[in-house]
C-alpha cells in the first residue's frame, strides 16, 4: 500500500475493508499526554524539551504527582500517553510501579508508554 501511487484507490479499498468488518461505525479514543520528566541524559540537537538534572526548570513527577495530574481527566479518557526524557536515575522498576499505579487507580485507562529510545535506555 505504501508504494502505490494511487492513493484514492488505496483509501477506497481501506473503506471497503472497514465497512465489511464494522459497517458504518466509527471509533474514537480520548487520551491525555503527561510528560513525567524533562530530565534527559541525551542532548539531541533538535530537542528543545530536554533539561539537565540541575537545570532550574527541570522537573520529574513522582508517582503521586503523576496520578494527581491524571485524576481530573480520568473519567473522560480511555488512554494516557506517558512520555519524557531519559531520566538518569529511573529504572524499569520505576516505570513498572508507575504503570501498576495507573492501572490500580484507573483500570479502564490504557497506558501508552516508552519509546524505543526509552526502552533502550532502560
What are these regions (language model features)?
Residues 20-22, 26-65:
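Canonical Radical SAM [4Fe-4S] cluster-binding loop centered on the CxxxCxxC motif
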Residues 51-67, 73-94, 98-99, 103-122:
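Core AdoMet radical
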Residues 15-16, 34, 100:
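Active-site phosphate/pyrophosphate- and oxyanion-stabilizing loops and adjacent acidic/basic residues
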Residues 1-2, 30-35, 84-88, 117:
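Conserved short loop/turn motifs at secondary-structure junctions
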Residues 14, 44, 82:
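Conserved, mostly hydrophobic/aromatic
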Residues 35, 70-71:
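Short, flexible, glycine/charge-rich loop motifs used to bind or transfer phosphoryl groups or to couple energy/partner
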Residues 1-27:
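An N-cap/entry alpha-helix motif that binds or orients negatively charged groups
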